[in-house]
UniProtKB/Swiss-Prot annotation:
InterPro entries: HMG_box_dom, HMG_box_dom_sf, SOX-12/11/4, SRY-related_HMG-box_TF-like
Underlying gene: sox11
Classification via SMART domains: HMG (SM00398)
An example Gene Ontology CC term for this record: nucleus
Organism lineage: Eukaryota, Metazoa, Chordata, Craniata, Vertebrata
DNA-binding residues (ranges): 48-116
Stated name of the protein: Transcription factor Sox-11
Region entry Disordered, spans: 1-24, 115-174, 197-231
Biased composition (Acidic residues): 201-216
Protein function: Transcription factor that binds to the DNA sequence 5'-AACAAT-3'. Acts as a transcriptional activator. Plays a role together with nlk in neural induction during early embryogenesis.
GO molecular function, one term: DNA binding
CDD domains named in the record: HMG-box_SoxC_SOX11
Polar residues composition-biased segments: 1-11
Low complexity bias: start-end ranges: 158-169
Keyword annotations of the record: Activator, Developmental protein, Differentiation, DNA-binding, Neurogenesis, Nucleus, Transcription, Transcription regulation
């Protein structure tokens, strides 16, 4: 009887002793902990957990081993190592864990047939609960803050007092752009618990401001033009040779020119009014050299020969009498002087019309001679 009892104990121990892997599976599985407990996959709060997959089954075993070897290792570091090791496993090594995960899934379905995966949502923290009651309502949603939204005008050089008075007792906050932009004034948010809101100016307002600035600029330019003393150009009659100065026509022209100057006729350099005003007198600039007198050889006569008759005749309606055969009164008439350039250096008495002669005698002869050859074939160079 004792031998039979020993043999029965041996048989029962052989049948009940599972393999190492199966023992680990059973040890880590909730069924092995308490198969009779129907709430084996529920938490204390009544939440039903999902069944473990193959990786969870394998990681539960390996995690216990690592925690036994190095209890001070952080849980996140253990999870990283387990993930790397699971990827390195072969498919044949994963098969037993896949089978155990399938068994747990079927057990889970049998015990909880009405289970549906519903992930727990994290409760949203109400931001208004932590804030005081006065700031609970956001300024965008509150109708009072919309009506209390203040317009932020651009700062002008003379608008600092207006901006300070508009903000009331609250201090105004001036913000200047870092990139050279415009300045804006923001009211203090503490004033009467109204939220300051920046409303940018419309394009129409900006255009009106630009038009006002242009008008001010034009008024300023007109004032400067009026304040500036108008330049008066004194036109003096240049005396010509003795033969021409004794003529009556020349003296009459000189007298009329001086009368125009006395009457206050002025030349305006206003580019805007040149085309608009038709009453501006036309300027007649006549450069008429005095012909060389035949019998005069004194230095004063040479000086008179170099003088040019510069007359500015200003007429409002009737053109003046043509001077020295001038065909058109409003055109510039120029007549060349037929004289030797050597006489320029003679008799200089310090007048601003005397110019020194830098020409050599050879160059003077070339200028006095014929400039063009009779035959154009002489101008062709042959190489």
């Amino acid at each position: 009887m004792v031998q039979q009892a020993d043999s029965l104990d041996m048989d029962s121990s052989q049948h009940t002793e599972p393999d190492t892997e199966e023992g680990e599976f059973m040890a880590c599985s909730p069924v092995a902990l308490d198969e009779s407990d129907p709430d084996w996959c529920k938490t204390a709060t009544g939440h039903i957990k999902r069944p473990m997959n193959a990786f969870m089954v394998w990681s539960k075993i390996e995690r216990r081993k690592i925690m036994e070897q190095s209890p001070d290792m952080h849980n996140a570091e253990i999870s990283k190592r387990l993930g790397k090791r699971w990827k390195m496993l072969n498919d044949s090594e994963k098969i037993p864990f896949i089978r155990e995960a399938e068994r747990l899934r079927l057990k889970h379905m049998a015990d909880y047939p009405d289970y549906k995966y519903r992930p727990r949502k994290k409760p949203k923290v109400d931001p208004s609960a932590s804030k005081p009651a006065s700031l609970a309502q956001s300024p965008e949603k509150s109708p009072k803050s919309r009506s209390a939204g203040k317009k932020c005008p651009k700062l002008k050089p003379g608008s600092h007092s207006g901006s300070s008075s508009s903000s009331g007792s609250a201090k105004s906050l001036t913000i200047k752009s870092e990139y050279g932009g415009d300045d804006y004034v923001f009211g203090s948010p503490k004033a009467a618990s109204k939220a300051a809101k920046c409303v940018f100016m419309d394009e129409d307002d900006e255009e009106e401001e630009e038009d006002e600035e242009e008008d001010e600029l034009q008024i300023r330019i007109k004032q400067e033009e009026e304040d500036e003393p108008l330049r008066q150009y004194n036109v003096a009659k240049v005396p010509a040779s003795p033969t021409l100065s004794s003529s009556s026509a020349e003296s009459a022209e000189g007298a009329s020119m001086y009368e125009d100057v006395r009457n206050g006729t002025r030349l305006y350099y206003n580019f805007k009014n040149i085309t608009k005003q038709s009453t501006i007198p036309q300027a007649t600039i006549t450069l008429a050299p005095a012909p060389r007198s035949a019998g005069t050889t004194s230095p004063s006569s040479h000086k008179d020969e170099l003088m040019f008759d510069l007359s500015l005749n200003f007429t409002q309606q009737n053109p003046p009498v043509p001077e020295l055969g001038n065909p058109n009164s409003g055109n510039l008439s120029l007549s060349l002087v037929d004289k030797d350039l050597d006489s320029c250096s003679e008799g200089s008495l310090g007048s601003h019309f005397d110019f020194p002669d830098y020409c050599t005698p050879e160059l003077s002869e070339m200028i006095a001679g014929d400039w063009l050859e009779a035959n154009f074939s002489d101008l062709v160079f042959t190489y």
